[in-house]
UniProtKB/Swiss-Prot annotation:
Gene Ontology biological process: double-strand break repair via homologous recombination
NCBIfam families: addA_Gpos
Origin species: Acetivibrio thermocellus (strain ATCC 27405 / DSM 1237 / JCM 9322 / NBRC 103400 / NCIMB 10682 / NRRL B-4536 / VPI 7372) (Clostridium thermocellum)
This protein's name: ATP-dependent helicase/nuclease subunit A
Source species taxonomy: Bacteria, Bacillati, Bacillota, Clostridia, Eubacteriales
Catalytic reaction annotation: Couples ATP hydrolysis with the unwinding of duplex DNA by translocating in the 3'-5' direction; ATP + H2O = ADP + phosphate + H(+)
EC nos: 3.1.-.-, 5.6.2.4
Disordered, as annotated region: 544-565
PROSITE patterns per record: UVRD_HELICASE_ATP_BIND, UVRD_HELICASE_CTER
């Protein structure tokens, strides 16, 4: 294949295009990273005009992406060098790669600041503050600001506090100030933004409110809704065409349509005081009474058209009461009254910024926001007229770089955009900008990403070759099967538009199939298949539905009832998902297994649990239920929730211990420690403690109990108090991390939790706690009290962390993750669950809303009457935020669906299927190819988008049948996508498990079956039996289970065992971590364990061993010190050895394979009497390091990391002979295949010992 033919035409244009500004819109799975790398490679290896790689600035979104990019470029350069080994230029590029600017925007900013620190008067020895430290400094600064306001008795401050400070304290106002400070950091010049937006509320009298930013947003919103109402009335008129007995209705509905048209005409006209004219028109909008009809009418159609008219009335009422509520002068008067309050709020933020900056300066630290703003300060200058121009430093960077390449451009914010502009825009000599991304995957607005930056260029750049500003669309998807591609296109062509989604999903944006799958699959397997849509009804079928309206006028269930309903809904969905996963793992009715295409082996294989991912909009409240339900069904599952760390028992116990070391006069933490294994009080002993002195503090009662000296509880109390006093003394001079180290050691708690269920996870959590304490001690805040205070603030601000990660990519489990975490990943089978969950619009209920373009949106508050209502500015911002939030939700759905490679399953739950489908039917009953933006923005969840779209699919009649196909009047679409729609009720789903009633019934039957116990009359027989002696006492001392290591020891009694030289291998991370040992560094045993762990988890298909080890560190699978102990060169030597090459050539490689087999007792205990061991067996357990299969049998490989003296090779062979023989025996029993060869590989010197 030539270099050109392996790329599509569009990809080749993106690789070779030399336009000044090039925007590449790369759809999901379009190979954008490969294109980016190839463009760089072509530039630096161009024979006529090569560009040194250190003259390219490559900006990525994350450090991991930067590392991956650097590795891929290095690999590509190496391949070019192999093709042309004599090229001095390619060798030069490989040398320059180390200093190339392939980096995140923050790292680039840091480089600019360090090189030009003198320009901004900053200490050149500054460091970047830990997030913990910066938050604490910010809180301290905020407290100082508020204290000053109280001391100065600032009236404006007290007025602001009265209006927005909350009922009991000033916490709500403090949070407001913090939120506003954080919000403005994504603006290039935060204080200028504050000034501008504050002054925008001081509107001159006589202004047409419709000409303000807020007014124009509200009028645009009203226009979209009026167009939606027009479609609804037109739908009703269409129904009335052939509705018998309803002819008189038609004139009334025509009048309604004319009134709506008149309002739309006013909105489209440019006129003086347009707002007031529309206000007056709305006030005069009257709905005529529907005339009476005869008895012979079509009742069903009458009900439908009446419901449509009621909805129209409700919307017009909303315009009057909540949107266009008064004339311009009245609105302006309200906003002017809010102006001093917003000015005071802005001043508080400025004071916070000033004090926070002072604290950072004193400690010579900066935070991540400072990196961008300081960099911008260095790169810009202000002219006398206030305009911004590039500084000399910026111009020097323009001269340095030949091109700037920005990855994930859709996630940029305005500060980052300005930085790029300063070093790229200008004359023809300035570097060009290559931007690549996909606005349909912009899902980080909560991090202040600005997708409109991408959209602005997308809508203005031309596709023409040679245009100075050009766009190229990469729409071919190389990831997914055609079934997935067609389904995604079918949905998004209908639901995504500029009104809802901020982009029209046209044929240009649609995905094109480009993946390569072997379509000649074997007949005994099933592959791909239709996209599945499972809809669950969670309410009982026979329930009398008294309410369905979830709006403001609907019945409000109490909080407990809602929580219970939500949990029930999640359980139902989890059970259905679990059932579907089990079905995928089993053969179908024809005995065929569902299979996926393995790219590495270039063949199909049976689907495994690791191939399946469950994507949730949020894991909170959902993931735990899914884990529980799937686990009960026997499905191995792991959820990366990102929360729950502080709720784990082991972390709570250790934090409680730290709390009472700091202050023992705290009953609840003390009780937690006493009940834990650290002290081990039983419930009876706790009761005894409380009775010592019922009114005293628990700590005082504990001292009295210890002083009594009576009983076991007193002994425990005395020992614990002695230890507590010792730890309290240590805390005065010992850092928190070292104190934790000491506590783990003294209490043995680390080892204790390791023996508990999920012990490895618990130990990992304790290591994370230690690491968190170590990081805290590196900040300027030190000491136990400050650490406890920080943790309390972290918990109270919902700053929980996820539990430690102990999962590797090779673990065969179903993964549960949020859609956000799945971005950039792909999975063979994707289940998008929870589609019935309501969108989270809670942020729109805050007292003051904020928007980058619209500024402040406060409530109007009359604190004397204790009344508040949203200002028109807030209403405008609310509409804007809602539209932006729902557009982002639509993009999040797009990200979720495009993660699937081979199989896509969508699930969601509703209370009542019929009523849900009726609602969707209203949205779907349009004759246009795209559903209305009005209906999409009215959706409450993903189902409200997916449902109406599927109702219009020609082959989804089953969904339409829920309400009767005759009621559907929309456009039926004959689309190539293939769907399977299944509707479930609660009973269907619950049948997959045992119901609670069933369980209770079985329990009662068991109780009834019990006979009343009668006293025994056979005393003599009882005594005889109790005095019986077991004849095989000696055999009873033989263990039922023994390890291969023990066998080796017994067979090598002649040779002494040197533990340091020949360590036993233990599972990784079971022993105490290095920081608990009384020595520095890692033992030989630990190093051997770590090497075995790495060999188990390495992807042999990748050559970047070092990078994989770094990834293990990033995932908390290894510590940095453990990673340093692994010699990648020795691993590579093994893989390049004849044995290693044979292994890599095998299609079946198995690593760290545990086994349990039975062996006769006398094989091990030869000195036991024959009668004692006769017929007895032992369970032999062990773990085979590695074996691989060849056509004529199995090859067994065991790794050893021992140091071997030159003359001791045969000793090694003899020492491990028995172990290897038993490994081979176990493998033959497990696989039924012959082990033809057995080897030990010595990592120390690369020798291979055969047996």
């Amino acid at each position: 294949m030539s270099e050109r033919t392996k790329w599509t035409d569009e990809q080749w244009e993106a690789i070779t295009g030399n336009e000044k500004s090039l925007l590449v819109s790369a759809a999901a799975g379009a190979g954008k990273t490969a294109v980016l790398v190839e463009r760089i490679i072509r530039k630096i290896t161009d024979e006529e005009n090569p560009v040194d790689i250190d003259r390219l600035l490559v900006v990525t979104f994350t450090n991991a992406a930067a590392t991956e990019m650097r590795e891929r470029i290095a690999q590509a350069i190496s391949e070019k060098l192999e093709e042309n080994p004599g090229s001095a230029n390619i060798q030069r590029q490989l040398t320059l790669l180390g200093k190339a600017c392939i980096t995140t925007i923050h790292s680039f900013c840091l480089e600019v600041i360090r090189s030009n620190f003198q320009q901004i008067n900053i200490d050149p020895g500054f460091r970047i503050a830990d997030e913990t430290e910066s938050r604490l400094m910010k809180l301290e600064a905020l407290d100082e600001v508020f204290e000053e306001q109280y001391e100065n008795e600032n009236e404006d401050f007290f007025e602001l506090l009265e209006c927005y400070g909350g009922n009991r304290d000033d916490r709500a106002l403090q949070d407001m100030v913090l939120n506003l400070y954080d919000f403005i950091q994504s603006s290039p010049w935060p204080e200028e933004w504050l000034e501008k937006m504050t002054e925008s509320m001081n509107i001159p009298d006589g202004t047409d409110f419709g000409k303000t930013l807020w007014g124009s947003v509200l009028l645009s919103s009203v226009k979209i809704e009026l167009e939606g109402l027009k479609e609804m009335i037109s739908r009703a008129l269409e129904i009335l065409k052939d509705a018998s007995g309803l002819e008189k209705y038609r004139a009334v509905y025509m009048e309604d349509l004319a009134n709506v048209d008149a309002l739309l005409k006013l909105l489209n006209e440019e006129s003086e005081m347009q707002w007031d004219r529309i206000f007056n028109a709305l006030q005069g909008f009257e709905f005529a009474t529907l005339p009476r009809c005869g008895r012979e009418v079509d009742k069903d159609k009458q009900e439908i058209v009446k419901k449509i008219r009621d909805d129209v009335k409700q919307r017009i009422r909303k315009f009057r009461e909540k949107v266009i509520t008064s004339v311009s002068n009245e609105i302006i008067s309200d906003l002017k009254a809010l102006y001093p309050k917003m000015k005071c709020l802005a001043n508080l933020v400025k004071q916070l910024a000033e004090k926070y900056a002072e604290k950072k300066n004193r400690k010579s630290v900066v935070d991540f926001n400072d990196l961008e703003h300081f960099c911008l300060e260095i790169l810009t200058e202000r002219k006398e007229d206030g305009s911004i121009i590039p500084s000399r430093t910026a111009i020097s960077y323009r001269e340095r770089f030949a091109e700037i390449l920005v990855d994930e451009y859709q996630d940029s914010n305005l500060v980052q955009e300005t930085i790029i502009n300063m070093i790229s825009k200008g004359d023809d000599a300035s570097p060009g900008v290559f931007m690549v991304g996909d606005v349909k995957q912009s899902i980080y607005r909560f991090r202040q990403a600005r997708p409109e930056l991408f959209l602005e260029k997308y809508n203005t750049y031309l596709p023409d070759k040679g245009s100075p500003c050009r766009k190229i669309i990469l729409s071919r998807n190389f990831r997914s099967r055609r079934e997935v591609i067609d389904a995604v296109n079918f949905l998004f062509k209908q639901i995504m538009s500029t009104g809802a989604g901020e982009l029209d999903y046209t044929d240009a944006e649609a995905l094109n199939f480009g993946a390569v799958f072997d379509e000649n699959a074997k007949e005994d397997i099933t592959v791909g298949g239709e996209v599945e849509f499972h809809l669950i009804q969670t309410e009982d079928e026979d329930k009398n539905f008294t309410f369905e309206n979830e709006g403001e006028e609907g019945r409000q269930a109490d909080e407990g009832e809602e929580d219970e309903e939500m949990l029930d809904s999640i359980q139902c969905e989890a059970r259905l998902v679990g059932r579907r996963i089990l079905e995928l793992m089993k053969p179908d009715e024809n005995g065929r297994y569902f299979s996926v295409f393995d790219k590495a082996k270039n063949e199909y294989r049976r689907v495994e649990y690791r191939d399946v991912v469950i994507l949730l909009r949020t894991t909170r409240n959902w993931a735990e239920v899914f884990v529980d339900e799937l686990s009960v069904m026997g499905i191995p599952v792991f959820a990366d929730t990102g929360t729950g760390f502080f709720k784990t028992v082991e972390v709570q116990v250790m934090l409680s211990l730290l709390q009472i070391i700091d202050n023992p006069l705290q009953d609840i933490p003390l009780l937690s420690v006493l009940r834990s294994p650290i002290v081990g009080f039983t419930t009876d002993e706790l009761a005894e403690l409380r009775l010592v002195d019922k009114k005293a503090l628990l700590f005082d009662a504990l001292k009295k109990l210890a002083e009594s000296g009576q009983g076991e509880a007193a002994g425990k109390a005395s020992a614990f108090l002695e230890n507590l006093q010792k730890w309290r003394e240590m805390s005065l001079y010992m850092s928190t991390d070292r104190l934790l180290w000491q506590l783990y050691n003294d209490t043995g708690y680390y080892s204790i939790v390791g023996a508990m269920p999920a012990g490895e996870q618990r130990q990992a959590n304790l290591r994370i706690l230690y690491e968190r304490a170590r990081q805290f001690e590196e900040t300027s805040y030190k000491g136990l009290f400050n650490f406890i205070n920080f943790i309390d603030k972290l918990k109270s601000s919902r700053g929980d962390m996820g539990s430690a990660k102990i999962l590797s990519e090779n673990d065969n489990v179903v993964r549960i993750m949020s859609i956000h975490k799945s971005k950039g990943l792909e999975f063979p089978v994707v289940i998008v669950a929870g589609c019935g969950k309501k969108f989270n619009l809670q942020d729109m209920n805050k007292s003051i809303l904020l928007h980058h373009e619209l500024g402040f949106g406060p409530d109007v508050v009359d604190h004397k009457l204790r009344l508040s209502w949203p200002s028109v500015a807030k209403q405008a911002i609310r509409e804007k935020i809602k539209a932006e939030t729902l557009s982002e939700e639509m993009r999040i759905l797009y990200v979720a669906l495009t993660r699937a490679r081979e199989k896509l399953v969508i699930t969601g739950a509703v209370k009542n299927v019929r009523k849900a489908v009726e609602k969707w039917l209203d949205s779907a009953s349009v004759q246009k190819s795209r559903l209305s933006a009005y209906d999409m923005l009215s959706g409450a969840n993903y189902l409200d988008w997916i449902g109406p779209a599927l109702l219009r699919h020609k082959n989804c009649g089953g969904l339409r049948d829920c309400v009767g196909s005759a009621g559907f009047r929309g456009l039926l679409i004959d689309d190539p996508s293939v769907w399977s729609v299944k509707i479930w009720n609660k009973t269907d789903v619950q049948s997959s498990g045992v119901s609670e009633e069933q369980g209770e019934s079985e329990f009662i039957k068991w109780l009834d079956s019990l006979e009343k116990e009668e006293p025994s009359e056979y005393a003599e027989e009882t005594a005889r039996r109790l005095s019986w002696s077991y004849p095989y006492v000696k055999a009873s001392k033989v263990p039922a289970k023994v390890s291969v290591t023990e066998l080796k020891r017994r067979y090598n009694e002649v040779v002494s065992e040197d533990v340091m030289q020949f360590p036993d291998y233990m599972p990784v991370l079971v022993k105490k971590p290095m920081f608990l040992e009384e020595k520095k560094g890692l033992t030989y045993a630990e190093k051997g364990t770590i090497l075995h762990f790495v060999m188990q988890h390495l992807d042999y298909g990748r050559e970047d061993i070092e990078a994989q080890i770094e990834e293990m560190v990033a995932k908390d699978l290894l510590t940095p010190q453990q990673a340093q102990s692994v010699d990648a060169a020795r691993i590579r030597r093994f893989l390049n050895s004849p044995l290693g090459k044979r292994m890599l050539a095998s299609k079946s490689i198995n690593r760290e394979v545990p086994f349990n087999i039975e062996i006769p007792c006398h094989e091990l205990y030869r000195d036991m009497e024959d009668e004692a061991c006769h017929g007895e067996t032992l369970l032999l357990q062990g773990v085979v390091d590695c074996y691989f299969e060849e056509p004529d049998g199995i090859v067994l490989v065991d790794y050893k990391t021992d140091y071997v003296a030159p003359g001791n090779v045969e000793t090694i062979r003899e020492r491990y002979k028995v172990q290897i023989l038993y490994y081979a025996r176990a493998l033959e029993m497990l696989t039924g295949k012959k082990v033809k060869e057995k080897y030990i590989y010595l990592f120390w010197d690369g020798r291979i010992l055969g047996f």
